[in-house]
Amino acid sequence: MTSERSRIPCLSAAAAEGTGKKQQEGTAMATLHRKVPSPEAFLGKPWSSWIDAAKLHCSDNVDLEEAGKEGGKSREVMRLNKEDMHLFGHYPAHDDFYLVVCSACNQVVKPQVFQSHCGRKQDSKRNASISWSGAESRQALEQRQV
């Protein structure tokens, strides 16, 4: 069942009052104060087209992009070491996030570390096979000498 708001592409404060809907006292939603198109009307289109249609501006008529730059200075930022860049990627907040499963040990790892993970597994297998083949060759040599 869809609500009345989801079927109406735009809903302003006047439209809400015209339908008999009551606004809460002193706590009206920001979208009721100005006409904003519903994102559902822009399904399958880029967000930029919705932003252009909505003409979103801050209350002091500063664009949202500029406000974001100013507000970004006060945000807390966690810095990552350059040595860990192969683990987290260049821009972790913007990079796509994928996980892969190692078929040898069923461990879930990020693709960035999968090669080193397999390298460690291969190295441990090689060391085991080298020591086994070394012992086997010693036994073969001893049998030939007898």
Swiss-Prot record:
Polar residues composition bias: residue spans: 127-138
InterPro entries, A to Z: Ataxin-7-like_regulator
Disordered: annotated segments: 1-27, 125-146
Transmembrane residue ranges: none
Name of the protein described by the UniProt record: Ataxin-7-like protein 1
Origin species: Mus musculus (Mouse)
Gene: Atxn7l1
